[in-house]
């Protein structure tokens, strides 16, 4: 069995997640914890299978992948870092935005 990679979250992604969670709790009372639940699920997937997300072609940084969270309609943008090997979540971006996140 493969070991889970540690996951770091950038300051930008932390702020985006907080904003999304605040909005979601106010506007989606039937599923107030959906953002957190979907992020936990995504983290579980990418920590074991870093290549699970599609290559992010809508940003200028190379090596970035994105995983779609269909239930909440957000993308998690992340990349694999080495030495030590780990995942960094770079952005949390709603699918309705016309362009990619500011990376």
State where each predicted segment sits.
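Enriched for short, Lys/Arg-rich terminal
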Residues: 69-103
């Amino acid at each position: 069995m493969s070991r889970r990679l540690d996951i770091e979250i950038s300051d930008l992604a932390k702020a985006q997640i907080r904003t999304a969670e605040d909005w979601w709790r106010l506007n989606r009372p039937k599923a107030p914890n959906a953002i957190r639940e979907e992020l936990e699920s995504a983290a579980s997937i990418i920590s074991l299978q870093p290549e699970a997300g599609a290559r992010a072609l809508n940003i200028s940084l190379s090596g970035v992948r994105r995983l779609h969270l269909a239930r909440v309609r957000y993308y998690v943008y992340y990349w694999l870092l080495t030495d030590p090997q780990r995942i960094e979540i770079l952005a949390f971006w709603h699918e309705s935005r016309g362009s990619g996140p500011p990376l």
